[in-house]
């Protein structure tokens, strides 16, 4: 995180950006700024406009109106090639590496010959503390290291503006810490990072500034240290008058009051030797008034278990739900 308030001109300044799809206003005059050595976190619910704004900055989608100021020059629209030339690189949530190619081949893929510099690559690896075997296959890397290879692809192209889309979504806490350590080293070189995430604790740890998008607008923006968690949550999910709610929104508001109440410690869900696709012999009990955390690496079976409990997948074993008027029991051989 940047600790000094003395900054050069912004790396990126988006002004009054508008975008419409089929008559629906997706972006409504967005202003967004990124400085050197800064992490600017971008939050918002699904459909808030985050992805559209980043696609416009990366040259994937044109804006209907507005300007992007980069390096002191104004642009009405960019192409992906032009964005790369201006030093903008989008790192997707799922790294787009070729698993059967080496790490070196992945980093250099698609680069012009004049940009191919092994010494530059080695310098970047050393600066970021990466100890890759450049000749090993990219498919052998864990998710955190794949993210770093994607970032290195951008840095080899002299990118100064990195857009990280949910970079920790598939990472364990240890992998997240390793990624953050390398990002801090990267920030010291003057790179600016747009960090898209829904994880507030991580955002508070890594971000200098936070902007919250809602319904195509910037609902809240400021220094991380000056924004409370309540402010951020309220900006993401504001209280609105009932008359402006849709029927489905009203239903969701009514549901909590209609749920049966149980004394704390009363079992509301019990699993006994539950087996399904991606998991086996899972036994656990969820009690009223508690939050039961389910942790594991990517592919450990967490999603499959949740989908089985919801009824989307077949199961073998025993499930008992006690929260209904009468206990509900379901078992399969």
From Swiss-Prot:
SMART domains reported in the protein's UniProt record: AAA
Similarity comment text for this entry: Belongs to the ABC transporter superfamily. AI-2 autoinducer porter (TC 3.A.1.2.8) family.
Segments forming domain ABC transporter: 12-240
Matching entries from PANTHER family are given as: AUTOINDUCER 2 IMPORT ATP-BINDING PROTEIN LSRA, CARBOHYDRATE TRANSPORT ATP-BINDING PROTEIN MG119-RELATED
Q: Which InterPro entries does the record associate with it?
A: AAA+_ATPase (IPR003593), ABC_carbohydrate_import_ATPase (IPR050107), ABC_transporter-like_ATP-bd (IPR003439), P-loop_NTPase (IPR027417)
Q: Which amino acids does the record list as binding ATP? A: 44-51
Q: Which UniProt keywords apply?
A: ATP-binding, Nucleotide-binding
A Gene Ontology molecular function term of the record: ATP hydrolysis activity
Its source organism is Escherichia coli O139:H28 (strain E24377A / ETEC)
- Gene name, per UniProt, is lsrA
Protein name (Swiss-Prot/TrEMBL)? Putative autoinducer 2 import ATP-binding protein LsrA homolog
Coiled-coil spans are none
- Has the keyword Glycosyltransferase been applied to this entry? no
């Amino acid at each position: 995180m940047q600790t000094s308030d003395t900054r050069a001109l912004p790396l990126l300044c988006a002004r009054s950006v508008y975008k419409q799809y089929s008559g629906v206003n997706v972006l409504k005059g967005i202003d967004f700024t990124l400085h050197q050595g800064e992490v600017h976190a971008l939050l918002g619910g699904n459909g808030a406009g985050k992805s559209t704004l980043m696609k416009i900055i990366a040259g994937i989608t044109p804006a209907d109106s507005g300007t992007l100021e980069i390096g002191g020059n104004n642009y009405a629209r960019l192409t992906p090639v032009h964005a790369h030339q201006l030093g903008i690189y989008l790192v997707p949530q799922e790294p787009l590496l070729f698993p059967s190619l080496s790490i070196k081949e992945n980093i250099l893929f698609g680069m012009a010959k004049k940009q191919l510099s092994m010494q530059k690559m080695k310098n970047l690896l050393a600066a970021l503390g990466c100890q890759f075997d450049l000749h090993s296959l990219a498919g052998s890397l864990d998710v955190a290291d794949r993210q770093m290879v994607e970032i290195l692809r951008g840095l080899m192209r002299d990118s100064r503006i990195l857009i990280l889309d949910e970079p920790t979504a598939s990472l364990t806490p240890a992998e997240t810490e390793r990624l953050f350590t390398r990002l801090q080293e990267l920030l010291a070189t003057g790179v600016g990072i747009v960090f898209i995430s829904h994880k507030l604790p991580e955002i508070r740890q890594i971000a200098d500034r936070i902007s919250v998008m809602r319904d195509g607008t910037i609902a809240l923006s400021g220094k991380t240290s000056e924004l409370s968690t309540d402010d951020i949550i309220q900006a993401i999910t504001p209280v609105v008058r009932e008359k402006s709610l849709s029927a489905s929104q009203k239903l969701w508001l009514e549901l909590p009051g209609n749920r049966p109440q149980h004394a704390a410690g009363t079992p509301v869900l019990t699993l006994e030797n539950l087996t399904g696709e991606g998991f086996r012999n899972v036994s656990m009990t969820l009690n009223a008034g508690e939050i039961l955390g389910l942790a594991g690496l990517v592919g450990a079976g967490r999603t499959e278990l949740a989908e089985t409990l919801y009824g989307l997948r077949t199961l073998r074993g025993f499930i008992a739900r006690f929260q209904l008027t009468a206990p509900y029991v379901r078992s399969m051989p």
